Amino acid sequence: EGVKKFLEYQPEAVVAVGGGSAIDSSKAIREFALKINNYGKVGLIAIPTTSGTGSEVTSFAVVNDTAAHVKYPLISESLTADEAILDAELVRSVPPAITADTGMDVFTHALESYVSTAHNEFSSALAEKAIEICGVFLLRAYLDGSDMHARKKMHVASCLAGLSFNTAGLGITHSMAHQLGAMFHIPHGRAKAMLLPHIVEFNSDINKHSKSQKEYLPAVKRYANVAHILGLSNYNKVMTVRSLVNWIQFMQKEMNIPLTIQ
């Protein structure tokens, strides 16, 4: 329906205002419409009203097939918006539950891009700052939605994390959350929050690790760095990663995010 309307109207530009789903829909509509009739350059301006997906600065879009219970990720440079406008006033009234879900979406984006095997200095720097902001301001934004300083910080963190994973990519938390959300209609950020502690344990193998630092998996050092950014530490890297898992679960409990899908 969106593609049909687009081709009928033939706009000079598309303004996508909303959360990740609205922005992704606009991206996909423009993409497929111009494949049918490429009548010229059509700009896309993305204005996010949640602090979560970072879709305003990525070359990704996710399309949800509600009948088949499947989410399809689309990836193409042509999906990237031409301009992104960040205004934290647009997230002032976001309810606490959505603030929690989208905030953990930001954190997961930053964490997964940071530990990605495709990371580089630029993506890592962006991810580190987003992680630092989440550690300080996510709970503040959840507890007091009128705290505009926290809102602004989380809005920026969402964009930073989007820029990071657009370069470095994401991990299995993201892909599993797509299918979990599509099948059980769980908000994407909430699904990722529920999965993330288990994925960190799996990727770092902290439940089976030898105490010999020589045998640590590469992900252990990266996860330990994340823990340090959050102000967490312990007497060795494995225990430091364990403190990161505990911090994620603490945030879930503080923001009333379920620990399981039951």
What spans do the regions from the language model cover?
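A glycine/threonine-rich phosphate-anchoring loop and its flanking beta-alpha core
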Residues: 31-121, 206, 218-225
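Flexible, glycine/charged-enriched surface loops at secondary-structure junctions
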Residues: 118-126, 141-153, 168-173, 213, ...
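C-terminal and late-domain segments of enzyme folds
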Residues: 100-160, 164
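N-terminal small/polar loop signature for handling phosphorylated ligands or for N-terminal nucleophile
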Residues: 1-38, 139-151
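Glycine-rich phosphate/pyrophosphate-binding beta-alpha loops
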Residues: 52, 159-192
